[in-house]
Curated annotation (Swiss-Prot):
Active-site residues per Swiss-Prot or TrEMBL entry: 19 (proton acceptor)
Pfam families, A to Z: Pept_tRNA_hydro (PF01195)
Organism domain of life: Bacteria
UniProt site positions, description: Discriminates between blocked and unblocked aminoacyl-tRNA: 9
Protein name, UniProt field: Peptidyl-tRNA hydrolase
NCBIfam families tied to this protein: pth (TIGR00447)
Subunit structure: Monomer.
Length: 191
């Protein structure tokens, strides 16, 4: 069993923020793979389903970004999962918009959701980095991250989320390189 976590902030006012692209990824995966109903558990929203042959739990912490680790830690302990079962989908400033990269472990790069998970569980988990691009100057980062995707970006956003969901079985079985390559190919074809 695997636990896939999408990072974001709860509430409709945050739903379309770049910072919530992790939530968006999980919502798309749940829809494409016909996951079960949403349950309120572990200080978040949990859905159960299968991706390929793997049982996968999707968790969106409802704790706000800075406390995501509380929710994730609670779920990991309840299901007695090792760190190799944890996959975290998050927005990444230092990646071009709509690029997808998988990375094992590492630092938090100033991301408060990753910092919280690191604090509660340690750094050794798989990250699916979802590029939102950098606004160019550090003074504009907060407004960029907490801003909505522009109308002109919607097609690229939908293409990225759809590609992630379509290729999710590769991620579930640990074929991270093919997962990334196939997403990039789908995006080139869509563009």
């Amino acid at each position: 069993m695997q636990l896939w976590v999408g990072l974001g902030n709860p509430g409709p006012q945050y739903a379309l923020h770049r910072h919530n692209v992790g939530f968006m990824a999980l919502d798309t995966i749940a829809e494409v793979h016909n996951f079960g109903p949403v349950q309120k558990k572990f200080q978040g929203w949990l859905q159960e389903g299968r991706i390929g042959t793997e049982k996968v739990l999707l968790l969106k912490p409802a704790t706000f970004m800075n406390e995501s680790g509380r929710s994730v830690g609670e779920a990991m302990r309840f299901y007695k999962l090792g760190m190799d079962a944890l996959v975290v989908f998050h927005d990444e400033l230092d990646l071009a918009p709509f690029k997808v990269k998988v990375k094992q472990g590492g630092g938090t790069a100033g991301h408060n959701g990753l910092r919280s998970i690191d604090k509660h569980l340690g750094p050794d988990f798989l990250r699916v980095r979802l590029g939102i691009g950098h606004p160019g100057h550090k003074d504009r980062v907060t407004g960029h991250v907490l801003g909505n995707f522009a109308k002109s970006e919607q097609d690229d956003l939908v293409d990225m989320l759809g590609a992630i969901a379509s290729e999710a079985a590769l991620l579930a079985k640990g074929d991270n390189v093919l997962f990334m390559n196939n997403i990039a190919l789908r995006q080139q074809t869509a563009g």
